[in-house]
Curated annotation (Swiss-Prot):
Multifunctional regulator of the expression of viral genes that mediates nuclear export of viral intronless mRNAs. This immediate early (EI) protein promotes the nuclear export of viral intronless mRNAs by interacting with mRNAs and host NXF1/TAP. Phosphorylated in vitro by SRPK1. Its main location: host cell. This is mRNA export factor ICP27 homolog. Pfam families: Herpes_UL69 (PF05459). Disulfide bonds: none annotated. The lineage of its organism: Viruses, Duplodnaviria, Heunggongvirae, Peploviricota, Herviviricetes. Residues 129-144 have a biased composition (Basic residues).
Length: 452
């Protein structure tokens, strides 16, 4: 390999890509000296990768740094993260006219840079490495790193000193100026609210608490007397929730329960309040049974061609039931929606409940949430009836639903998902614990085709 020489012709121009990420304030002499050093070391011909390009003669002008456009890495704590890019670099030498040098061709030379060193068969260029080392030391001296953490006493002193109070007053003045400029009202507690909060609880006595308990007890006793009477079914007592009721039995006696809700308006309001109280504290198993109770009730009324009133205790508490199911099955449904194959469907539980599309139904879990969300939305809007078309797209309302499938189907989905997923959140969040102090008020029947 022949040694490269540097011509002194001032017309020679050079465009050089940044090999060593030099600082922008470097003098032109250092830049030209470094390129000259590369030529003298005869390392321009080292090839990157499997390239076999040989070395060429390099021409450098003293003013070549005018075309020098370096690319720098980001600074962190006064030091550079990566001073050199770990990839091959190219030195491009361009002549405005080849006749200035006797028709000689000047071609591109290559150099390989690895971790700040120029690899070649003969030598290394250590000049840039020394510069990087010296600059790093000077940066450490000029730009100290993060100051040491303050002790509790120092932090308290800084909080209570005069400079801190001065900064706080300036910030408060700036906020006040902005508020006046844009006419922003001041957010403050009203005098009436201050008076109410300060005197809260002053009138509570033992007698007033006892009177409240007696009033609630009278309402519960009145409701329990009606629930245990013969008015629930024609010719006998309604089976209740202690034993399972078959679908034919519910079709036989269900209209009597419907008539009871229509006859006792006051007791229906009590039933709604007690049922909502029970539903909000139900466990997962009990919440799934309540979901089956709601959907079975809707299916029975549609089969008998009866109007579905929203003031019915079973229908009126659908919003509380939906909130409890979201709380119990939220992590499981979130993982289920993210991993399903349908890319066009809803990907989150809030999106599923907001859109309430029949096309989002892919399993019994999504079916339960979409149906109950549709019913709850109608109740919240204040409608008097639930239209059949709002809850079913078939001629026979809820034809695809089997009584008891919410409990059996969701438990089956949980078991299958636990085997496939294995996430701890999906398993522990659906732990079916029972509340020992939950009373069965507001629960009217249990109808399930499955033995579970």
């Amino acid at each position: 390999m022949a040694s490269a020489s540097i011509p002194t012709d001032p017309d020679v121009s050079t465009i050089c890509e940044d090999f060593m990420n030099l600082l922008p304030d470097e003098p032109s002499d250092d830049f030209a000296l470094e390129v000259t050093d590369w030529a003298n070391d005869e390392a321009i011909g080292s090839t990157p990768g499997e390239d076999s390009t040989t070395s060429r003669t390099v021409y450098v002008e003293r003013t070549a740094d005018t075309a020098y456009n370096p690319r720098y890495s980001k600074r962190r704590h006064g030091r550079r993260e990566s001073y050199h890019h770990n990839r091959p670099k190219t030195l491009v030498v361009v002549l405005p006219d080849s006749n200035h040098h006797g028709g000689r061709d000047v071609e591109t030379g290559y150099a390989r840079i690895e971790r700040g060193h120029r690899r070649s068969s003969r030598s290394y260029n250590t000049q840039s490495s020394r510069k990087h080392r010296d600059r790093s030391l000077s940066n450490r001296r000029r730009r100290p790193t993060t100051p040491p953490a303050m002790t509790t006493g120092e932090r308290n002193d800084q909080t209570h000193d005069e400079s801190y109070r001065l900064r706080f007053s300036k910030r408060d003045a700036r906020r006040e100026r902005i508020r006046k400029e844009y006419d922003i009202p001041v957010d403050r507690i009203t005098g009436r609210a201050i008076e109410v909060v300060s005197t809260a609880g002053a009138s509570v006595t033992i007698d007033s608490v006892r009177h409240l308990d007696e009033t609630i007890e009278k309402l519960v006793v009145r409701y329990a007397t009606i629930q245990e009477g013969d008015s629930w079914a024609s010719g006998g007592c309604f089976p209740g929730i202690k034993q399972n009721t078959s679908w034919p039995e519910l079709m036989l006696y269900g209209h009597e329960l419907y008539r009871t809700f229509e006859s006792y308006k006051m007791d229906s309001r009590i039933a709604r309040a007690l049922r909502e109280r029970v539903i909000r504290g139900e466990s997962l198993i009990e919440a799934l049974e309540s979901a089956d109770e709601l959907l079975t009730w809707i299916k029975m009324l549609a089969a008998k061609n009866l109007p579905i009133y929203t003031n019915n205790p079973i229908v009126a508490t659908s919003k509380s039931l939906l909130e409890n199911l979201k709380l119990k099955l939220g992590p499981f449904v979130r993982c289920l929606l993210l991993n399903r194959d349908n890319d066009l469907g809803s990907r989150t539980l809030p999106e599923l409940l907001r859109q309430q599309r029949f096309s989002d139904i892919t399993c019994i879990t999504t079916y339960m949430f979409v149906m109950i969300a549709r019913i709850a939305n109608i109740v919240v809007r204040g409608s008097k009836f639930v239209e059949y078309d709002d809850i079913s797209c078939n001629v026979q309302v809820l034809q695809e639903y089997t009584p008891g499938s919410c409990l059996a189907g969701v438990l089956e989905a949980l078991i299958t998902h636990q085997r496939e997923c294995g996430r701890v959140e999906c398993t522990l969040s659906t732990w079916a614990g029972h509340l020992s102090d939950a009373r069965p008020y507001g629960k009217y029947f249990k109808c399930s085709t499955f033995n579970c």
